[in-house]
Amino acid sequence: MKAEQKHTPMMQQYLKLKAENPEILLFYRMGDFYELFYDDAKRASQLLDISLTKRGASAGEPIPMAGVPFHAVEGYLAKLVQLGESVAICEQIGDPATSKGPVERKVVRIVTPGTVTDEALLSERIDNLIAAIYQHNGKFGYATLDVTSGRFQLVEPETEEAMAAELQRTAPRELLFPEDFEAVHLMSNRNGNRRRPVWEFELDTAKQQLNQQFGTRDLVGFGVEHASLGLCAAGCLIQYVKDTQRTALPHIRSLTFDRQDHSVILDAATRRNLELTQNLSGGTDNTLAEVLDHCATPMGSRMLKRWLHQPMRCVDTLNNRLDAIGEIKDQSLFTDIQPIFKQIGDIERILARLALRSARPRDMARLRHAMQQLPELEAVTSSLAHPYLKKLAQFAAPMDEVCDLLERAIKENPPVVIREGGVIAEGYNAELDEWRKLADGATEYLEKLEADERERHGIDTLKVGYNAVHGFFIQVSRGQSHLVPPHYVRRQTLKNAERYIIPELKEHEDKVLNSKSKALAVEKKLWEELFDLLMPNLEKIQNLASAISQLDVLQNLAERADSLDYCRPTLNKEAGISIQAGRHPVVEQVTSEPFIANPIELSSNRKMLIITGPNMGGKSTYMRQTALIALMAHIGSYVPAESAHIGSLDRIFTRIGASDDLASGRSTFMVEMTETANILHNATKNSLVLMDEIGRGTSTYDGLSLAWASAEWLATQIGAMTLFATHYFELTELPNLLPNLANVHLDAVEHGDSIAFMHAVQEGAASKSYGLAVAGLAGVPKPVIKNARNKLSQLEQLGQGNDSARPSTVDVANQLSLIPEPSDVEQALSNIDPDDLTPRQALEELYRLKKML
């Protein structure tokens, strides 16, 4: 006997469908429930906290089973998607009444974290991306797709560090990778990783898939034809999305190559340390996005976050944004635009559901409502003068045909789903109106029949009713059932009543049920035709969504600039940063005391600042605010300062704070040194580098030596604009030994055992660190502080007696370098070829090298 014949016909059907979807959970529709069996049931029981039961037996073994009600399935799907799980939805498509065996079923959709479009399964203000990654000869191809907007991009990071930064920037909900992928550590601690066959990443297959999607002969028009690694990833990605959506993807119409030299590159540590959209605790409070994001639409909010994570270098584009923000701000247009945008809502995601033919009736109603706002938006934006704003306003012009179609076709307040009808408006289709009239006339007829029968037969308790099982019936109480005439045919007996049918009522039942069925069939046909009528407008709606998103970000930044007293930065092509009265955009919003604004000056003659001062004095805040102001300027935003001149940057690096990376087995010091090495290898003269407390995780002299050598390398070999905060006061000698360096400090004033932080940046080095005063503020017991003061005095006396050993007096040439010069012996050895030497010559060379030691 074959294995499948040991199972019931229904379980055979289930196992066949499960074999087609082995890696994911299968929701198998049975009546009013979606059931899961075997390992799926066990897994779902744990993930969803639902009961695990057993259903009879199959092949002699009890079958583990779990289930969820069909009407509540969206909530369970949302939880599974959040956990990175994918689910195949299997529906009954056959008619149980006519099925001889198990009712026919098939998988109608696959819900995955990266391809969901249902409103209930998405975070409103965060992009939902699916990505694919490919690796060859140490380089990477990486493609991302936002199914909810059609935005399809690829990039080719050249190092693991760059690839890690891209993964953090895009934060895909689902990540596809080939079976032979080597750098699997890049995907650790991530949900939604999907292993795919290697052949899905083949270049020829990828090009074929992409040309088929875009309806093109080649990819030259997209400027991606030479990005072979990126195309391998993009090909796998588009095939996977087609397989899961099981429908055409008409809104995915282009692919863009994201050139890294067009952006200010932020590595993973920098994104984390600057707290752009996520704070160090993993939340969203007290982040730059929280301060800047007052967008009126969810799609504007998502675009602003993309800008924050990918600042750009094109000065012309940035100045266009700044001009636009300035014009909106000067006219206070944001007060008129915001209320309109709040009514428009999230048409970007409605568009995706429209393209995938999964839009619901209320999506159509929301799209109609958005279209109805466009004439008012056109009136408000008619005064805009800047070409960039005028172009956006043109794309946001009224779409009268679409608006008229939706106004005629969809009821004012349609139901949630089309299943029971009641969606298409009256007057839209004559045939539908006719069938509805027949169905709706049933109520009047039944009321008249009930009154006539009650009067004719003298039965006070007679009622005409309907239920889905027995259809129409006449109900009479048990006490008056003896008054029922002979032509009443009993249909059902209840505890206190009898139910009957008569030929006249049966004839009407057939007519009504037929008209309801016909009306629903016509309505569903009209619903599908509505998608066909809207499809030609897809590109226009896509352009509309993009234009409104951009206008929303610009008006939002104008409002923020006006409300928070930001200034317009001046963007320069040459390197340098000059800020007067700069403020930290986040700290100034959350502090209860007035924020102390500070200047900064970095130029070709002043490349590095050695920053000293007490803990809690504001060094890290000062450094971060400089980076945030520079970043805000590079997204085209006004900045928190009295004035700001920002030169073009290629990268921003931060080495601020560290903690043990337990998952990778790395200590705090190892994390610190790894980040430092990344900076020393990749920073350029056009980079902004923030270095905070290098070397504190090891012994004093090791730490001091590493800090000194790192600062020296940045100053002499790289020439990056650097803010170097330290507690090693020996480093304040560097500006006396090297050109283009300066000392600045944040001061504090002691009053007995207390300390007041001034938070103001002053030229020159700090006089002391105030560490003991800070320890007192933290609550360290007074006897411990007293003992520490005594020990400090002893150490200072020892230090004064051994000044010659202080690192601050050592010549620069003798300083430890992280990348040391080769010795004379090493250079001599490198010039010797052992294969060319006779035994006598080798012996002579050995004596010569010994003398050099």
Curated annotation (Swiss-Prot):
GO terms for biological process: mismatch repair. ATP binds at residues 613-620. Belongs to the DNA mismatch repair MutS family. InterPro entries: DNA_mismatch_repair_MutS, DNA_mismatch_repair_MutS-lik_N, DNA_mismatch_repair_MutS/MSH, DNA_mismatch_repair_MutS_C, DNA_mismatch_repair_MutS_clamp, DNA_mismatch_repair_MutS_core, DNA_mismatch_repair_MutS_N, DNA_mismatch_repair_MutS_sf. This protein is involved in the repair of mismatches in DNA. It is possible that it carries out the mismatch recognition step. This protein has a weak ATPase activity. Keywords: ATP-binding, DNA damage, DNA repair, DNA-binding, Nucleotide-binding. GO terms for cellular component: cytosol. PANTHER family: DNA MISMATCH REPAIR PROTEIN MSH1, MITOCHONDRIAL, DNA MISMATCH REPAIR PROTEIN MUTS FAMILY MEMBER. This is DNA mismatch repair protein MutS. Pfam families: MutS_I, MutS_II, MutS_III, MutS_IV, MutS_V. It comes from Vibrio campbellii (strain ATCC BAA-1116). GO terms for molecular function: ATP binding; ATP-dependent DNA damage sensor activity; damaged DNA binding; mismatched DNA binding. The gene is mutS.
